[in-house]
Amino acid sequence: MVVRVASIMPFLVMKGMALADRLKEKDPWDIYYCVRNYPGGLDALAEEVRPHARRGLVREGLGKIANAFASVDHIGPVSVADFEEVSDLEERAFLCRDAYEWINAMLERVRQLSARPDPTGKK
């Protein structure tokens, strides 16, 4: 099943802000799920975020996501495993690692793309 939102960029920013304002396990899980399952993969997601990546609110939201997923032991990956109610230690470690790697790969791809000039000429 695919649930469409208007755009991934405002969704990620909103969820990033929610990470700081409330502590619900579903917020990091939503971020992980959407990043991992985005149609077209990380490159398509990063291309959609790219035109907005220099805006203050977007940087703030992505920064809060980066903080929450700064390591496999940070609140982001741990909340993903908690939300899925994973109790097996090996499976839990794998899920935390997977969440950490997906989110950090997305953030790095956005950084790489936003460092290059926009081919459309937009700022």
Regions found by a protein language model. Give the residues of each.
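Compositionally biased terminal segments of proteins
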Residues: 1-123
